[in-house]
């Protein structure tokens, strides 16, 4: 992950409405984390 601040937002139960971290590989256009 590029930012430690966002590590909290990367929680499995947390879903993003805006997909701004597709570079991390967590968000793939669907704004949802599949890990």
From Swiss-Prot:
The keyword Transport applies. It is found in: Cell junction, Adherens junction; Cell membrane; Cytoplasm, Cytoskeleton; Cell junction, Focal adhesion. One of its GO terms (biological process) is response to lipid. Residues 22-35 form the SH3 domain. The modification Phosphoserine is found at residue 15. It comes from the Eukaryota. Keywords: Cell junction, Cell membrane, Cytoplasm, Cytoskeleton, Glycoprotein, Membrane, Nucleus, Phosphoprotein, Repeat, SH3 domain, Transport. Residues 1-8 form the SoHo domain. GO terms for molecular function: insulin receptor binding; protein kinase binding; signaling receptor complex adaptor activity; ubiquitin protein ligase binding. O-glycosylated. GO terms for cellular component: adherens junction; cell-substrate junction; cytoskeleton; cytosol; flotillin complex; focal adhesion; insulin receptor complex; membrane. Interacts with the long isoform of AFDN and with VCL. AFDN and VCL bind to SORBS1 in a competitive manner and do not form a ternary complex. Interacts with ABL1, CBL, CBLB and INPPL1/SHIP2 through the third SH3 domain. Interaction with ABL1 occurs only after insulin stimulation while this has no effect on the interaction with INPPL1. Interacts with the insulin receptor but dissociates from it following insulin stimulation. Also interacts with SCA7, PTK2/FAK1 and flotillin. Interacts (via SH3 domain 2) with PXN. Plays a role in tyrosine phosphorylation of CBL by linking CBL to the insulin receptor. Required for insulin-stimulated glucose transport. Involved in formation of actin stress fibers and focal adhesions. This is Sorbin and SH3 domain-containing protein 1. It comes from Rattus norvegicus (Rat). The gene is Sorbs1.
């Amino acid at each position: 992950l590029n930012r430690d601040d966002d590590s909290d937002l990367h929680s499995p139960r947390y879903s993003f409405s805006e997909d701004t971290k597709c570079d991390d590989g967590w968000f793939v256009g669907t704004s949802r984390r599949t890990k």
